[in-house]
Curated annotation (Swiss-Prot):
It comes from Shigella sonnei (strain Ss046). Belongs to the cation transport ATPase (P-type) (TC 3.A.3) family. Type IA subfamily. It is an enzyme of class 7 (translocase). This is Potassium-transporting ATPase ATP-binding subunit. The keyword Iron does not apply.
Length: 682
């Protein structure tokens, strides 16, 4: 579920951004953007020249110089406005999160158990390791782990999802977030962070982006822009002595206008806005990124590790068939399977009970009335079952049942091995049922591959991204599902160690890897991955290890995260191409206007047939300022993204933004020149 989207030009945000744009005119703020700092210096210089001309201290056209100066200041203001608007949108999103934080009191327990004596303390004084009790109606005062109890929790303030979730001690659902509300029952929580370090605090800080650090690609692009600016600065500086030597020295105002039009002011003015907007778009997808670096890395990813359950398949495996062992009838197998599943509350367990009822009219029986003992599933045993009337019935994975039989002196039958392989080859998961040391047969659990997922993987393959399915299933089942889903590779019988080793293997090959995870056992792999999306419903360890948190806890979101990252990189590249390309038109406008008096041959370059030198220079400066405003929506929304190969994407963007960057300024400058002439302003 995504949060409510802000309008691109929300009136209140625009007003606030205009105020911030004026505040950013101070030198300290401008220094952070070297390209726009040069424009700021040029604005200041031409303003001083205009005042000097108006007072008679300097010869020259004071009105023309003032017009150039005014539009240079407008250029700086527009660049400031773009950045301030992007930051304002992020801060508006952060303000909605700040509303979640409430000054409250917490019941700090003196001992780590329910019913212990408690002291009432302000929530902001809780420290890591403190134990608190929260009951129905209470706001959870800190991030932490549930050490006792279970409760229904409303996390809508954080995730935007109205459906409550269950949080309980033990397992992967013990993590709670400060600012969420208990709806029923009670929890004893151990705080896992100190004040100011909660997940909500970090979310607000990341979204506001007040101290946003530049990403590596941003730094590299900034260095390129600085280099271009220095080259054009030196080139412009050498033109004055050439014109003076020709007997008609060009004014400093014209040289400043030439410099500002030649340096890449368009991308220089929009670069920060693109980065902030990328983070904001990620939040729009209900994903919190720890930094712009994480969003950027998502755009460079070329390997996706995807969990099978919930990402590739629907995740609700259902019993589809009872396959009895040799000498066992199907009803006997179904009866034993149903008994072993009576107290199994998993979707798989309930589906076994229902299938036995549908096939053989075996009515569901109550475990307590049977005076039976239920044996729950554990990660160590990997099986569950029931002890009833001296009968010991178990169901579980093939390996687990094989070990169980051999430990009891039995032998795993060869015909059942064949049936297990048959089920696995069909893409189903085999569960083996055993009574004592006698194997009764196999239950086939069928999961459904999500509709359209194969086409999405084909698109990712076009983009050069390799998809790898991660599953705990055996190799035969994994291979069948991988073929059906259309993934490039798979890791079967996956363990945390195997995931970590696979990530390191791909990284050693120079690839960037993205993955999702929610459990403590996923933390090492999440920490190793280049893009690690932790589920908000997961453990604290997983969230701390990842560099993104999906508030919807939807593993499929990883594909959308990659799309957003690629869109940000494409937006930056496209606007850089446009910015550099449109310098060509400005060159044809200003060079003839500035130097035709000294070198008449340069009139041949006036292909736009602009009205006069003054109108040509002023038109180019006005266009240079206005194009920043026209491109703000593109910088904030991102360029149109289509899953294409790298070469096809490059060709497409060169045609649209390269050719567009060449043609648009010719049209724009000519139109502005005509308007200035018609209005008698030049």
């Amino acid at each position: 579920m995504s949060r409510k989207q802000l309008a691109l030009f929300e009136p209140t945000l625009v007003v606030q951004a205009l105020k911030e744009a004026v505040k950013k005119l101070n030198p300290q703020a401008q220094w952070r953007n070297p390209v726009m700092f040069i424009v700021w210096i040029g604005s200041l210089l031409t303003t001083c020249i205009s005042i000097a001309m108006a007072s008679g201290a300097m010869p020259g056209n004071a009105l023309f110089s003032a017009a150039i100066s005014g539009w240079l200041w407008v250029t700086v203001l527009f660049a400031n406005f773009a950045e301030a608007l992007a930051e304002g949108r992020s801060k508006a999103q952060a303000n909605s999160l700040k509303g979640v934080k409430k000054t409250a009191f917490a019941r700090k327990l003196r001992e780590p158990k329910y019913g212990a004596a408690a002291d009432k303390v302000p929530a902001d004084q809780l420290r890591k390791g403190d134990i608190v009790l929260v009951e129905a109606g209470d706001i959870i005062p800190c991030d932490g782990e549930v050490i006792e109890g279970g409760a229904s929790v409303d996390e809508s303030a954080i995730t935007g999802e109205s459906a409550p979730v269950i949080r309980e001690s033990g397992g992967d659902f013990a993590s709670v977030t400060g600012g969420t509300r208990i709806l029923s029952d009670w929890l004893v929580i151990e705080c896992s962070v100190n004040p100011g370090e909660t997940f909500l605090d970090r979310m607000i800080a990341m979204v506001e982006g007040a101290q946003r650090r530049k990403t590596p690609n941003e730094i590299a692009l900034t260095i390129l822009l600085i280099a271009l600016t220095i080259v054009f600065l030196l080139a412009t500086a050498t033109l004055w002595p050439f014109s003076a030597w020709g007997g008609n020295a060009v004014s400093v105002t014209v040289l400043v206008a030439l410099l500002v039009c030649l340096i890449p002011t368009t991308i220089g003015g929009l670069l920060s806005a693109i980065g902030v907007a990328g983070m904001s778009r990620m939040l729009g997808a209900n994903v919190i990124a720890t930094s712009g670096r994480a969003v950027e890395a998502a755009g460079d990813v070329d390997v996706l590790l995807l969990d099978k359950t919930g990402t590739i398949t629907l995740g609700n495996r259902q019993a589809s068939e009872f396959i009895p062992a040799q000498g066992v009838d199907e009803k006997t197998l179904a009866d034993a399977a149903q008994l072993a599943s009576l107290a199994d509350e998993t979707p798989e367990g309930r589906s076994i009970v229902i299938l036995a009822k549908q096939r053989f009219n075996l009515r569901e029986r109550d475990v307590q009335s049977l005076h039976a003992t239920f044996v729950p599933f554990t990660a160590q045993s990997r099986m569950s079952g029931i002890n009833i009337d001296n009968r010991m019935i178990r169901k579980g994975s093939v390996d687990a049942i094989r070990r169980h039989i051999e430990a009891n002196g039995g032998h795993f039958p060869a015909d059942v091995d064949q049936k297990v392989d048959q089920v696995a080859r069909q893409g189903a998961t085999p569960l083996v049922v055993v009574e004592g040391s006698r194997v009764l047969g196999v239950i086939a659990l069928k999961d459904i591959v999500k509709g359209g997922i194969k086409e999405r993987f084909a698109q990712l393959r076009k983009m050069g991204i390799k998809t790898v399915m991660i599953t705990g299933d055996n190799r035969l089942t994994a291979a069948a599902i991988a073929a059906e889903a259309g993934v490039d590779d798979f890791l079967a019988e996956a363990t945390p160690e195997a995931k970590l080793a696979l990530i390191r293997q791909y990284q050693a090959e120079g690839r960037l890897v993205a993955m999702t995870g929610d459990g403590t056992n996923d933390a090492p792999a999440l920490a190793q991955a280049d893009v690690a999306v932790a589920m908000n419903s997961g453990t604290q360890a997983a969230k701390e290890a990842g560099n993104m948190v999906d508030l919807d806890s939807n593993p499929t979101k990883l594909i959308e995260v990659v799309h957003i990252g690629k869109q940000m990189l494409m937006t930056r590249g496209s606007l850089t191409t446009f910015s550099i390309a449109n310098d060509v038109a400005k060159y044809f406008a200003i060079i003839p206007a500035a130097f035709a008096a000294t070198y008449p041959q340069l009139n041949a370059l006036n292909i736009m047939r602009l009205h006069s030198p003054d109108s040509a220079i002023l038109s180019a400066v006005i266009f240079n300022a206005l194009i920043i405003v026209f491109l703000i929506p593109l910088a904030l929304k991102g360029v149109s993204y289509k899953p294409l190969t790298a070469s096809a994407m490059l060709r497409r963007n060169l045609w649209i933004y390269g050719l567009g960057g060449l043609l648009v300024p010719f049209i724009g400058i000519k139109v502005i020149d005509l308007l200035l002439t018609v209005c008698g302003l030049v």
